[in-house]
Amino acid sequence: MKHDRKGNDPKRSDKKIFNKEPLFILDVRNENDFSDWKIEGHDFDHLNVPYFDLLDGVEDILEKIPSDKEVLVVCAKEGSSVMVSEMLSEAGHSVSYLKGGMKAWSEHLEPVKVGDLKDGGEMYQFVRIGKGCLSYMVISNGEAAIIDATRMVNFFIDFAKGKGATITHVFDTHLHADHISGGRVIAEKTKATYWLPPKDAEEVEFDYQPLEEGNDIIIGNTTIKIQPIYSPGHTIGSTSFIVDDQYLLSGDILFIDSIGRPDLAGMAEDWVGDLRKTLYSRYKALSKDLIVLPAHFMIIDELNENGSVGKQLSTLFSENHGLNIADETEFRHLVTDHLPPQPNAYQEIRETNMGKISPDEEKQREMEIGPNRCAIR
C-alpha cells in the first residue's frame, strides 16, 4: 500500500533539534559529503546510502527503515530525495524529504531571545543551525544593531521591522573567512552605519566606519552600550563586544567548547601569541559574570535548553580546555598542530567580504557549503 510522502521545510527539522525530538534521516548524498557534514540532533539516527545505489529500487534498505520513527530523506538540493521518498512511499513507508536539500538547510536561521537589556531592550541570537553560525541583534527604544550578520540579509531586515525597530548600526567582529557577511549589504539597504575593525579592512574596497576600542556605541535613547574590545588572534583585527555590561560577544576568538583558529589568513605562527594574550590576559581581566555569546558553535550539545548558545565566562574558564593550558609552548602546539581543514572556498569568501569579487547568489551558496571550521578543540 502506498503511504504519504511530503516535503518538510528546514524549519520543521530545526524544531526537532531544539525540542530534542527523535528523527531518522536517510541521507542519499555520497559518503564523503555525508561524513563531512550532516544534520545532527540529540535523538537522530542516520543511514547513508548514496542515491546511485538506489536507482534500481529501495528493497535492500527497507528493513533498515524504522516504522516507529519519523523518516526524513535528505540530499544536496532536493531532487534525489524526492525520488527516493517516492520509492519508499510506494513500498509502504510514510516518509518526508527535506525541501531544498542541504543547501536550504545551510541557510535556515532560527531567532532565539537571549535576554532582556536595560529599560526594555532585548538581545536576540540568530542560530544558523546547518552551518554553526551565530548572529546577534540588539534592540533598544526603536533602534536595532546587528552583529556578524550572515548573507540572508532580508531575514534580519524583516525581523527588525517586525519588532518595530530601525537598523542603525551593523558590525562585523572581524573579516570573516568561513561565511559571507551580510553586514555591508544590510547597511546599504537600511542606511545604517557599517563598522569593521580597521586592521582587518586594509584591503577592502568599500567605505566603513573603523571599529576601535574606546569608541562606545549607544543603541536607542537609553543606556544600552556596545563596548568594543580589541581581541586579536583569530584575525589581526578581531574585536569583541561587551553589550549592556551583561554579554561578551566573542566573535571567533572564544567558543563554548573550543577556541578560535589563527590561520585563515595564513598567519598561524604569527597570530597564535595574540590569541593566547586575548584569551589568557584580556578576557581574564573581564568580569567573570559576563555571558559569552560566540559567533559559532561546534556541536549540538552546545545549545542551551531554550536553543541559544552561550555560557558564563567563569564557566568557560573552568570547563574549556583551550583556556586551561598553563604552558605557553604547549598552547602554541595545541593550536598550530591541530588545525582543522580550511573552510570551503575560504579565500573566495574573504575576497567577497573585502568587496573584491561579487559572486551571484548561487555561487555564494556553493562557496559556503560544508561545516563550521573556525575552531580548535
UniProtKB/Swiss-Prot annotation:
What species does this protein belong to?
Bacillus subtilis (strain 168)
Q: Which InterPro entries match?
A: Metallo-B-lactamas, Mito_Persulfide_Diox, POD-like_MBL-fold, Rhodanese-like_dom, Rhodanese-like_dom_sf, RibonucZ/Hydroxyglut_hydro
Q: Name one GO molecular function term.
A: sulfur dioxygenase activity
A Pfam family of the record is: Rhodanese
- State the disulfide connectivity: none
Q: Which PROSITE patterns match?
A: RHODANESE_3
What top-level branch of life does the organism fall under? Bacteria
Task: Report the active site residues.
Answer: C75
The protein's matches in SMART domains, at most eight in alphabetical order, are given as: Lactamase_B, RHOD
Q: By its UniProt entry, which Gene3D superfamilies does this protein fall under?
A: Rhodanese-like domain (3.40.250.10), Ribonuclease Z/Hydroxyacylglutathione hydrolase-like (3.60.15.10)
Domain (Rhodanese): residue spans on this chain? 19-114
A single BP term in Gene Ontology: hydrogen sulfide metabolic process
Q: What is this protein called?
A: Uncharacterized protein YrkH
